[in-house]
Amino acid sequence: MNRIYSLRYSAVARGFIAVSEFARKCVHKSVRRLCFPVLLLIPVLFSAGSLAGTVNNELGYQLFRDFAENKGMFRPGATNIAIYNKQGEFVGTLDKAAMPDFSAVDSEIGVATLINPQYIASVKHNGGYTNVSFGDGENRYNIVDRNNAPSLDFHAPRLDKLVTEVAPTAVTAQGAVAGAYLDKERYPVFYRLGSGTQYIKDSNGQLTQMGGAYSWLTGGTVGSLSSYQNGEMISTSSGLVFDYKLNGAMPIYGEAGDSGSPLFAFDTVQNKWVLVGVLTAGNGAGGRGNNWAVIPLDFIGQKFNEDNDAPVTFRTSEGGALEWSFNSSTGAGALTQGTTTYAMHGQQGNDLNAGKNLIFQGQNGQINLKDSVSQGAGSLTFRDNYTVTTSNGSTWTGAGIVVDNGVSVNWQVNGVKGDNLHKIGEGTLTVQGTGINEGGLKVGDGKVVLNQQADNKGQVQAFSSVNIASGRPTVVLTDERQVNPDTVSWGYRGGTLDVNGNSLTFHQLKAADYGAVLANNVDKRATITLDYALRADKVALNGWSESGKGTAGNLYKYNNPYTNTTDYFILKQSTYGYFPTDQSSNATWEFVGHSQGDAQKLVADRFNTAGYLFHGQLKGNLNVDNRLPEGVTGALVMDGAADISGTFTQENGRLTLQGHPVIHAYNTQSVADKLAASGDHSVLTQPTSFSQEDWENRSFTFDRLSLKNTDFGLGRNATLNTTIQADNSSVTLGDSRVFIDKNDGQGTAFTLEEGTSVATKDADKSVFNGTVNLDNQSVLNINDIFNGGIQANNSTVNISSDSAVLGNSTLTSTALNLNKGANALASQSFVSDGPVNISDAALSLNSRPDEVSHTLLPVYDYAGSWNLKGDDARLNVGPYSMLSGNINVQDKGTVTLGGEGELSPDLTLQNQMLYSLFNGYRNIWSGSLNAPDATVSMTDTQWSMNGNSTAGNMKLNRTIVGFNGGTSPFTTLTTDNLDAVQSAFVMRTDLNKADKLVINKSATGHDNSIWVNFLKKPSNKDTLDIPLVSAPEATADNLFRASTRVVGFSDVTPILSVRKEDGKKEWVLDGYQVARNDGQGKAAATFMHISYNNFITEVNNLNKRMGDLRDINGEAGTWVRLLNGSGSADGGFTDHYTLLQMGADRKHELGSMDLFTGVMATYTDTDASADLYSGKTKSWGGGFYASGLFRSGAYFDVIAKYIHNENKYDLNFAGAGKQNFRSHSLYAGAEVGYRYHLTDTTFVEPQAELVWGRLQGQTFNWNDSGMDVSMRRNSVNPLVGRTGVVSGKTFSGKDWSLTARAGLHYEFDLTDSADVHLKDAAGEHQINGRKDSRMLYGVGLNARFGDNTRLGLEVERSAFGKYNTDDAINANIRYSF
C-alpha cells in the first residue's frame, strides 16, 4: 500500500528529490554519496515534538509516542514543553508555539489528514487503504473517490460521510511557493508524525528496529525546508536525528510506511498551525532526509467544487415549497419551485461518489420531499433558515447536513435504519419528524433540538441512537420521549446533552472522555437516575456461533449431548472454539455449573463488583440519584467533573470522585522489554497506571451530597465543594484507593481496575470545601486538604491530614481522632461532648502557632477532654480563644495557650459581645491539666483550674490561674519546673485549708502575684498559718508577692510570709486586709439606678398632647408619637432610646369644656452603658388618659399606665457577669395649665405637672471567685414635679396653620430614689438614695392641614441634673374623624 522512495540531492532544486527505488543506480551507496548536507547550512533554532520513523537513542522513546498521539505533556495547547534526555539533561524547549492538535490525522496509521469535513490529504501511491478513523478510533469513514493529483504524489480522497468526531485542520495559505518554508519568521517550527517502520539509531548510526510499519504512531520535530519542483516539493535533512540545532528538540525521520503522513508548520501570520504537506519519500532506513508534497491548493479546491451541484435558492416570490423528486434507479433528482428547477445527483447503484453536495440559500426556505432521497456521499449545506418536510413519509440519506452559524433548519424527515444522520456546522437543526425514526444521529458541531412528534399511535423516537462528539455540539431534548437514554453516547471529546428540564433514567452512561457533558440548562430541576446495576434475570444467555467471536465475560449455554446435561460457561476472551464436553474450564471457557440462575447471578455479581465509570461531566440544574440494590459493593467512579445546583444521592455501594490520570500512548510488553534492554525504561504498556505522577485535576460541586450505607472516597487531584449528608456511611476525603481505566482514550468501553495512589505534592492532593454532616455511626476520614465544618452525631471523625481547617463544628457522641502526622486548625467554634484524641499530631484552635493575624475573632472551643499521646503531640490554642475541657497529656507532648495577633477592627456585634467575656485577657480556659511529663505554656490567659492539675514544665506569661473547686473543696497545681512572669495565682481559703501551688524542681521568673479569695468572712482576731506555695529552697523570695484583688465590692490583700522548711521554701498566708472598693460600689449603684433613668424618660413623654388637641372639630382621632433621644449621668453612664406611642381617643363636648378620653400603647427600646456595664432594656406598656380643654384657655391632663421591662446586661464589676431580669413599673400623672393670648396669634402658657410612680425592687445574687456577693435595690414610689412656661405664635393660611413654640421647665424629685445594698465577704454597706432635679428647654412646631391632620415636632434637652437628657426629638401625627 505504501512504498518509500529514495532521495537524491538536486542542485537545481537545492534539496532532495524523490527517485523510485527501482530507478537505475539508486542504491543506498549512491544515495549516501550524493546526499551532501546542503540543508545543514540552514540554522534551525526551534522547539517541536516527535513522531513515527527513526529517532535517536538519547531521548526516551515514550516522548515520541506521546507526541504523536497528543498525550502526556503534549496535549493540544500545552506551551513551553521542556525536553530532557534519558540522563535527565536538558535538550530544548518546545516554546515557539503551543502544541498543535493532531486529531485531524488518521488515528490508526497516520497516513491521511482531514482537510475538509469530507476530504483527507495523503499521497496517491498509497493505493491500498480504503478507510480512515479519527479521535479514539470508534468510527470509520470509507473512501469513495481517491482524487489523485495528475503530476504530484498527492491525493485528496472524498469520504462517504461528514466527519463529526474532529474538525479539519487548516492548510497552508501559501501553498507551493518556492522557498516559502525557509522563512523562519513566518514558519519557526515544523512537526510531523506517522506510523512508518520504527527504528532507533545510536550515535554510530546503528539502527535497531522496534516495529514494522503501521504498528504505532511516533512524532517529533524537523528543520526548515527547502523547495524544489517549482515549490511543489519540500525537503530537509530530517535524518540527522542527533542534530538538535538543525532539527529541533525531538528529531524524527520518516521511514517506509510514513508516506502520506502530515507535516505541520506554525504560521505566525495566521497565528495557527497549518498542514504544509504530506510525506512522499526518504532515502532508505535511517537515511539523511525526507521529502514532502506541498498541499496543492488549486487542485484540492477544484476537487471540492467538482462534488457540488449548483446552489439552490428559495424565492418567496415563486410561491410554494421546493418540491424535491428523486429517481433511485437513475440517481437523478430535481428540486422545483414554480418554473425554476435545480438538478441534483444522488447515489447511483452502489456508487456513493455519484452523490453531489447541495447548498441551500434564500430566507425562510421550504423543501418538500416527494420521494425518498439517497444522496450517497452528497451533503446538504444550509446558508439560510429552512424547513424540510415530507407529506408521504419519504426519507433522506447522505453524507450529512451542514447548518451555518446563525441559521436554523427545521428537519421533519426521518432517516433509514442502519444509517446515521451526520450534522455539523454552528447553526441549529431542529428535528421534528413524526413517529419512530429508525435512523441514528451523529452530531459534531452546533445545536440539535430533538422535537419529534408522536404518530397516530402515540409513538415517538427522534433517533435510534445519538452520538455526540468533537466537544463542539449540544443536543437538546424537548421531552423525555425523544430518545432512549441508553442509546446516547459521547464520542471523542464529547459535547453536551441538555435534558432541558426532563428527568431521565440511564442504565448505561457511554462517555469516551472528559468532553462528555450531561446538563440541564433551564430553571426546571431535572433528575438523572442511574440504574446500571445488572440484575441476574437480565443476564443474557448466548449460544455457540460459527464466527467464533464474542465478548469476554458473557454467559453461554451448552446442551451437552455427551452427558445429557445443560452446562453454563463464561467466555474468557474475544475468540473461542468448542465447549469442553467434560464440564471443565480451559483457557477460553470457565465452567460455572448446571444452574442457570446461579450462573446468571455469578455473572451479575461480577459485573456489579467491577463497578461503573463515568469520564464525563454533570452540569446545571440537576439532581442525580444512584440507588443500588443492597449488597452491591461495586463503585461508581467519576473522574470527570460536576457542577450541579441539586443533590447527588448515593445509596448503597461505593462512590469515588477522583482526578484523572493523564493518558499516555503505550506499546506492548515485548516492545517495552526490548527498549528496556537497551537502557530505555520510559515506554508504557497501558494508557494509565497507579504509579504515574501526572494526574489531571477535577472539580465536583453539588448543592448536597447525600450518602446512605455508602463507602465514599474523594481521591487524589479532586476538589469537592458541597454539603455532605452521611447516614451510616464511610466518608474518606483523601482516599488512596483510586481507579484507572485500562481502556482509557480508546472509546466508550471501559475496563476498571482498582489500586492505590497517594499524592505527595500539595497540588495533587484532594481538596474539600463545605460542610460534613454525619449521623448513624458514620465515619469521616480526613486525609488531605479540608476546609469546612463538621456536624456529627453518634459517629467518628479521624484526621490524618496535615492541611485540615475546621469551620464551625459540633460533635455529639462522636470522638475526634488526630492520627500521627496530622495537623489541623479549628478556625471557628468547636464543640464536642466527646474526647478529642491527638496522637503524635497537632491541633490548633483559632489560629496556628506561627500565625500573626490582624483579623482574629473570638472563638469558643469545648470538648469532653483534650487527650494528647506521644512526644510529638501538640495542642496550640491561638489568641482570643475560650477553651473548655480537661487536658490530658500522656507523654512529652506540648500544650500552648495564647500567642500573637490582634482583634479585627470590624467585629460583628455577636463577636463584640463574645469578646467581652475575656475580661481583658486574650484567652480563657476552664479545665484541669494532667500532663506530668509535658510542656505547657500560657500567655495572656485566664485559666480557671477546676481540679487538681500537674505539668512537667510550665511557662506562664501574663497569665492568671484561678483555683476552682471542681469536685473537691480545694485544688493543687503541681509542676516540676515553673517559669512565671507577670502572672497571678488566685487561691481560696476557708481560714483552715487553701488551694496550693507545688513546684518540685525549679521556679524562676519575676513580678508574680498571689491573690486570696475568702470563702467565709474571717474576723479581725483570726491568726492564719496556711501554706499557699511550696518551691525549692533556692527559689527567690520575691518570685511571689501578695497583691490586692477586687473581690465582690472589696479590695482584698493577703498578708504573706516566706519560710524555709525541710529543704523547701513556702509562701504562707498569715492574714488579710480588706477595704471597700468605691469604684465597684459606684458602678453597682449606677447600674441599680437604670430603672430610675428609664422612669424619667417615660415621665418626659407622659403629657404632650395639648398641642394636638386644641381646636379639633372631629369627634374622634388616632395618633402616633415617636421619640428618639439619649441621656447621660455620672459614672460614664449613657443611654440611647427610641420610644413609640400609639393611641386613640374620643371627644366629649361638656358645656364650656371639650373632654378627650383615650387609650394608648407604648414600646421603648433602650441601650444603656457605663464604664463597667452595658446592655439593653425593652419596655412594653399601655394606659389610659383624659384631657380637658376649657374655652377660657385652662386645661388639665391626667394619665395612668403600666410598663413591663425586659433587661439584658453584661456587668464587668464584682464578677457579676450576665444578668437577665424583668421589672415592672406604674405611672400616674396630672398636668394643669392656662393659655393666655397676648394677641390673636401669640400666647404664653404656664404649666405644672405632678407624676407618681411605683418602681419594683430588685435583688441579684452570684458568686465571685468563691465569694458570695449580692446587691439589692428596694422598691420605691418616686414623686416628680415639674413647672414651667411655654410661649408661641401661630401662622395661618386658607387650609393650614402652623404654631411655633418654645418652653422652659424645672423638673425636680420630691422623694429620694431607692437605697442600694451591697454585700460580700467583707460585709454589707448601703448607698443611700438621692434626689435629682434638672432644667428642661425645648422648641417645637405644631402644624394643621385641613380639618383632620395634625403634625408635631419638638426638640428638647436638659441641664444641671445628675441625669440629663442630652437630646430628644419628638415627632407625632394625629388624624381626626
From Swiss-Prot:
Temperature and thermostability: Optimum temperature is 26 degrees Celsius for hemagglutination activity.
Post-translational events: The C-terminus is blocked.
Site entry: Cleavage: 1100-1101
Consequence when changing residue 422 to Y: In strain: A2363
Start and end residues of each Peptidase S6 domain: 53-302
Keywords per UniProt: Cell outer membrane, Hydrolase, Membrane, Periplasm, Plasmid, Protease, Secreted, Serine protease, Signal, Transmembrane, Transmembrane beta strand, Virulence, Zymogen
Record flagged with keyword Transmembrane: yes
Tree of life domain: Bacteria
Example of a GO biological process term: proteolysis
Enzyme Commission no: 3.4.21.-
GO CC annotation, single: periplasmic space
Domain Autotransporter per the UniProt entry, residue ranges: 1111-1377
Active site location: 125, 153, 259
Entry-linked Pfam families: Autotransporter, Beta-sol_PIC_HAP1_IgA0_2nd, Peptidase_S6
Gene3D superfamilies referenced in this protein's UniProt entry, alphabetically: 2.160.20.20, 2.40.10.120, 3.30.160.280, Autotransporter beta-domain
InterPro entries per the UniProt record, alphabetical: Autotransporte_beta, Autotransporte_beta_dom_sf, Autotransporter_pectin_lyase_C, Bact_Autotransporter_VF, OM_autotransptr_brl_dom, Pectin_lyase_fold/virulence, Peptidase_S1_PA, Peptidase_S6
NCBIfam families reported for this sequence: autotrans_barl
Record remark on domains: Adhesive and proteolytic functions of tsh lie in different domains of the protein. The signal peptide, cleaved at the inner membrane, guides the autotransporter protein to the periplasmic space. Then, insertion of the C-terminal translocator domain in the outer membrane forms a hydrophilic pore for the translocation of the passenger domain to the bacterial cell surface, with subsequent cleavage.
Functional note: Contributes to the development of lesions and deposition of fibrin in the avian air sacs. It can act both as an adhesin and as a serine protease. Agglutinates erythrocytes while in contact with the extracellular surface of the bacterial cells. Can adhere to purified hemoglobin and bind with great efficiency to extracellular matrix proteins. Cleaves casein and exhibits mucinolytic activity.
The name this protein goes by in its record: Temperature-sensitive hemagglutinin tsh autotransporter
Organism: Escherichia coli
Name of encoding gene: tsh
